[in-house]
Amino acid sequence: AAAITLPAPTGPYNTTLATFKLTDKNRFDPYAPTKTPRALMISVFNPIPASQCSALLTPYMDPITAEYEDAVYAPLGIPAGTFGSLDLQTCKPNPRKAQAYPIVIFSPGSGNSRLGYSAMAQQVSSAGYTVITIDHPYDADIVTFPDHSTIIGIDVEEDTDFAVNVRAQDVSFVLNQLSQPSISE
């Protein structure tokens, strides 16, 4: 599919986008087949004044996730290659100390990837908020890590209370990580 650049957000700010893998070494992943620490992927959208923006096109989602989502949405008539062809208009991260903005945490609906909500998160960020989107492994349909390993979702709806508790622990962990300069700036 031909490259499609999504419209720039309409708020008073432009945005940067960074992704991070966070590993909770104090908690095992309750869904993993082996005893491994819980690892999450997050996206962080930060507002940046237009005067400090060095334009950058950023893929809407990584190629592995895009290919997976293409297959998921093919029965709905979405052409192959659609998700991989989408780009966001972002800015290169600014090495100067970032201004602190109010934080919005976004946890996607069960079975969905955080990446499907990137345009929405970017739009909110352009209004002057740091927006952090979280993938919940085994709950999201797919989570792809920087080393290209993936976790395909399972049906976590059998025990909704348990799934909600795991998500709450994920969000608490992410909030605790905000003190790390690489995430909050």
Segment roles from a protein language model:
Residues 33, 113, 164-167:
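Aromatic-acidic/polar surface patches that form glycan- and anion
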Residues 38-39, 62-65, 123-126, 151-153:
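Short, low-complexity, polar/charged sequence segments that are solvent-exposed and flexible
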Residues 2-104:
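Domain-level recognition of soluble alpha/beta enzyme cores
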Residues 138-185:
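Alpha/beta-hydrolase active-site loop
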Residues 84-144:
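Short substrate-entry loop that stabilizes the transition state in hydrolases
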